[in-house]
Amino acid sequence: MMRPFHLAFPVTDLKLTKSFYVNILKCEVGRSSDAWIDFNMFGHQVVAHLVDENDHPASNSVDGDEVPASHFGVVLTMSQWKELKNHLLEQKIQFIIEPKIRFKGEAGEQATMFFKDPSGNALEFKAFNDDNQIFAK
C-alpha cells in the first residue's frame, strides 16, 4: 500500500482557501490554526499556510500547453477524474488548461486538467487508462 504524501503550500486567505478546498475539491479539514489548515486530499495531507503574498513562478511548454512550473495534484482513477471534471464544470471553475487527453497515442497518455485555487496555486489532476503508463518513457 502506498503511503500518503505531505505537501505544504502558501495561501493569502485562509477563509477562501477553506471554502475552495472543502466545497470545490471536497477535501476534509483536519487540524488548523489561525495560520494554517490541514486538508485530506484523496487520502493525502496537504497544508495551506497563510502568507502575506504569493509569487508564482514561470511556466514550461508541455505537449503544446503552457504548464505552471509549480503545481500539485493527485493522479486519480479515470472515473474519479471524470467525476471531478464534471463537478468543476458545474462549479464554473476557470481552467488554466481545459480538461483534455495529453500525449494521445504516445507513452504516458493521460487525462489532465489545470486550475488555480483562490491564492493562485496551480493544481493538476490527472488520470491514466493504464497506471503502468504513469512512469512510461
Per-segment meaning from a language model:
Residues 47-48, 54-58, 131-134:
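A short local loop/turn or secondary-structure capping micro-motif enriched for an aromatic residue
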Residues 10-53:
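Core segments of cupin and vicinal oxygen chelate
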Residues 1-15, 72, 127-137:
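N-terminal beta-strand motif that seeds the catalytic metal site of vicinal oxygen chelate
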Residues 4-11, 40, 60-137:
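Vicinal oxygen chelate
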Residues 29, 37-38, 61-64, 104-105:
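Short secondary-structure boundary/capping segments
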Residues 7-22, 56-65, 92, 121-122:
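Short N-terminal helix-initiation segments at or just after the protein's N-terminus
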Residues 13, 43, 52, 76-78, ...:
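Non-catalytic surface loops within mature trypsin-like serine protease
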